[in-house]
Curated annotation (Swiss-Prot):
The keyword Nucleus applies. A motif (Nuclear localization signal 1) lies at residues 15-22. Involved in the biogenesis of the 60S ribosomal subunit. May play a part in the quality control of pre-60S particles. Component of the pre-66S ribosomal particle. Interacts with NOP7 and RRP1. Interacts with RSA4 (via WD repeats). GO terms for cellular component: nucleolus; preribosome, large subunit precursor. It holds the Pfam family Ribosomal_S8e. GO terms for biological process: maturation of 5.8S rRNA from tricistronic rRNA transcript (SSU-rRNA, 5.8S rRNA, LSU-rRNA); maturation of LSU-rRNA from tricistronic rRNA transcript (SSU-rRNA, 5.8S rRNA, LSU-rRNA). Its main location: nucleus. This is Ribosome biogenesis protein NSA2. It comes from Scheffersomyces stipitis (strain ATCC 58785 / CBS 6054 / NBRC 10063 / NRRL Y-11545). Belongs to the eukaryotic ribosomal protein eS8 family. Ribosome biogenesis protein NSA2 subfamily.
């Protein structure tokens, strides 16, 4: 035996520790914590080498996952119809056509139908800058502090909304610019109803504006449609549906929206 294989020789002669498997399992479980700690604490050249190594590992993992997914979609190779080869007995009960491609195409079709179902009347809207959205509020004894902002657009706040203490409130939503109801038009029925707003689902400008409940053109809101008497296929009354704002609420003074059917 070569001289450099003394460890393997010792293992063959005396075996391993009784708790070897348990220690190995625990070490592998701690590996994620060690990697996270190294990523946060390493500095300089060692940090660059570590980041390069992690990047290559992640790229290899993504390639492996992608290849695995493609193999699942494509499935095993099927024999050609015109080659004339006889199938073995244990393969006679299998279907010759590959159903994975059919499943994949049906999933894509469902995605297209879903996208068409939730297509909005206004797919593109004008961007709004922060200077237009926020107004700087000067505070302090000598009015030199400028960390507060006041929203100049209409907003929606919930029923149980309470303002934060004055010295901790960074963004102010004026009570005069708060909206609770919207003029919602049903595109198929052709009627306009004054419905209460339940919440802001998506503001196309920024996720922060969605969290603040800012109502701008193109915003998706949820409205209470129980007054319309809409029911599902199971006979249940529809409570809330999405609608898209089609006007500029800060210019018109009201919220006009189209129901997404």
């Amino acid at each position: 035996m070569p001289q450099n294989e003394y460890i393997e020789q010792h293992i063959k002669q005396h075996g391993r520790r009784l708790d070897h498997e348990e220690r190995k399992r625990k070490k592998e479980a701690r590996e994620g914590h060690r990697i996270a700690k190294d990523a946060q604490t390493l500095k300089g050249w060692r940090a660059k080498q570590f980041a390069k190594k992690r990047y290559s590992e992640k790229v290899a993992m993504k390639k492996k996952i992608k290849a695995h997914q493609e193999s699942k979609v494509n499935g095993p190779a099927t024999p050609k119809e015109d080659d004339g080869e006889a199938l073995p007995t244990y393969l006679l009960d299998r279907q010759t056509n590959n159903t994975a491609k059919a499943i994949s195409s049906s999933i894509k079709q469902k995605r297209l139908e879903k996208a068409d179902k939730f297509s909005v009347p206004l797919p593109k809207v004008r961007g709004i800058s922060e200077e237009e959205m926020f107004k700087v509020i000067k505070t302090g004894k000598s009015k030199h502090k400028s960390w507060k902002r006041m929203i100049t657009k209409h907003t929606f706040v919930g029923e149980g909304f309470t303002r934060r203490p004055v010295k901790m409130e960074r963004i102010i939503r004026p009570a005069a610019l708060r909206q609770k109801k919207a003029n919602v038009t049903h595109p198929e029925l052709g009627v306009t109803v004054f419905l209460p707003i339940l919440g802001v689902k998506k503001n196309p400008q920024s996720p922060m504006y969605t969290q603040l409940g800012v109502l701008t053109k193109g915003t998706i809101i949820e409205v209470n449609v129980s007054e319309l008497g809409l029911v599902t296929a199971g006979g249940k009354v529809v409570w809330g549906k999405y609608a898209q704002i089609t006007n500029e609420p800060d210019r018109d003074g009201c919220v006009n929206a189209v129901l997404l059917v």
